[in-house]
Amino acid sequence: MRIPPRLVALAGAAAVAATLIAGPVAAAAPASHAVAASSAASASVKAVGRVCYSALPSQAHDTLDLIDEGGPFPYSQDGVVFQNREGLLPAHSTGYYHEYTVITPGSPTRGARRIITGQQWQEDYYTADHYASFRRVDFAC
């Protein structure tokens, strides 16, 4: 069984908190690099868009529930690393994103709909067009 990425993220957050309590680390990127990285991430996030959780198809709700429960998932490909080859999501190292199928009723295949999860809490993206566009799920609406 795969460990859902958001559980790994919570463990990582605990490790970061422990490190911060123990003392700061004196290693930081030069300011020019930090600004460039921040600008690139902001531009990418703006290109993604948002979608209200309530506006998602019911099958996307089912997929998000399965992710939170750790499965079982309907397809063996569910939970695999999403490579972000399109470069539409914010840039992160390989393994940061994972993809899950959103079942498309009547489709003989997995269809085009997916949920992509990041490692942050509620960092979920929906695509209805097989990675041509993404919308971050807004759980507040």
Curated annotation (Swiss-Prot):
One of its GO terms (molecular function) is ribonuclease T1 activity. The active site is at residues 99, 130. It is found in: Secreted. Residues 1-36 form the signal peptide. The gene is rnaSA3. Keywords: Disulfide bond, Endonuclease, Hydrolase, Lyase, Nuclease, Secreted, Signal. Belongs to the ribonuclease N1/T1 family. This is Guanyl-specific ribonuclease Sa3. Disulfide bonds join 52-141. It catalyses: [RNA] containing guanosine + H2O = an [RNA fragment]-3'-guanosine-3'-phosphate + a 5'-hydroxy-ribonucleotide-3'-[RNA fragment]. It holds the Pfam family Ribonuclease. The keyword Acetylation does not apply.
